[in-house]
Structure formats: structure tokens, C-alpha cells
Amino acid sequence: MLDLFKAIGLGLVVLLPLANPLTTVALFLGLAGNMNSAERNRQSLMASVYVFAIMMVAYYAGQLVMDTFGISIPGLRIAGGLIVAFIGFRMLFPQQKAIDSPEAKSKSEELEDEPSAHIAFVPLAMPSTAGPGTIAMIISSASTVRQSSTFADWVLMVAPPLIFFLVAVILWGSLRSSGAIMRLVGKGGIEAISRLMGFLLVCMGVQFIINGILEIIKTYH
């Protein structure tokens, strides 16, 4: 049971900086201004469900995609590392606010014409929370843990759905209490946390690339 808690904790530490619910909160506040409370709550719940579904598909179908297209694990690690590092650099040195992103702009225009427009899948679930970096990390981690003997088989079977469920619950709670979070942390606080998470992502991305290169050297040496 202790191994299960360790696996869940490790999964959350890896995924939460990538998912970064606080930036999704800022985006949600910008897009949901014209919605009533019931509609905001519904969009929050749907976004969380979509995030859970995307992560589950990435974890369980990722290996099939790799086999179909002939993608090796070192190649995936290097590609995933580049994506994660790029996202980290963008969080460290943001060029545009979340509300100014193309996805947010198109949704803002929809909301002006249609108050009940859906923002749960795009941009809240994808790409804000479960974006390319998150998906690459999940697929790469799935390939890695299946080859490792760190955790028992039952832990590797039970932990991933629980990790994805907890990420979805954290996102749901953050979106439901978005107003309170923004008042408590403030815009500057969210930016500071985003930059800190960006630095962590750059470090994780570089380590991914190093691991991929070392595995290539070990394979072909």
C-alpha cells in the first residue's frame, strides 16, 4: 500500500507542473465572465472529465501509437523532452497572456455571440491542461514504468487511473473556486507560480533529453 502512495505522489509531482491548473484558472476566469454560476460549474466539471479521458487514452493507447508509427522509446523521450522544455521556456518568459492565446480569442468571440458556448474541451482541457507536453510525458512514462521493476505489477495497474483522477479532481476544485483563488493569490502570484513551474519543466525536459541520448548510446555502443 505504501508503494501505491509513493507511485501516486510521484505521478502527481510529474504531472501537476505540466497540467498547471492555476494557468487554466486564469484562462477560465477570462472566458467564463458572461456565464452564470450553474454554467460555470458545468463547464468546470466537463473540463475535468475531458482531462481524465485524454490522460487515460494517452496512457493506454500511447504504446499502440508508438508501435504503429515505429517510434522508439529514446526518440519519444527526446521529443517529449524538447516539447516539455519548450513549454517551460514559454512559462518562464511568457510572450502573451493566456486570454490572448489564439484558442482563447476564438472562444471569446464565440461567447460574445453564443453565451452557452463550450469552453470545456478547447481550450480548458486541451491544450491548457492536457496539452502536448502532458501527453508526451504520459506516453513516455507509460513506456518507462512497464519496463522497470521499481513498483509491483498491481501498483502499476492501479496507480495511473488514480493519478489521472486526482489531477482531474484538482482541476475541478481549482475551477470551481477560481474566483477565490484569484483573490487569494492574485495575478502576480499566479504568474510567479507559473514561472517556477516553468523552470521545473525546463529541468525535466533537459533530463528527458539526457536520458534519451544515454539510452541511444547504451543501445548502439
Curated annotation (Swiss-Prot):
The keyword Secreted does not apply. Residues 29-44, 90-118, 176-196 are cytoplasmic. GO terms for cellular component: plasma membrane. It is found in: Cell inner membrane. The chain crosses the membrane at residues 8-28, 45-65, 69-89, 119-139, 155-175, 197-217. It holds the Pfam family MarC. Keywords: Cell inner membrane, Cell membrane, Membrane, Transmembrane, Transmembrane helix. InterPro entries: Multi_antbiot-R_MarC. It is a multi-pass membrane protein. It comes from the Bacteria. Residues 1-7, 66-68, 140-154, 218-221 are periplasmic. Belongs to the UPF0056 (MarC) family. NCBIfam families: NAAT family transporter (TIGR00427), PRK10995.1 (NF008228). This is UPF0056 inner membrane protein MarC. It comes from Escherichia coli O9:H4 (strain HS). The gene is marC.
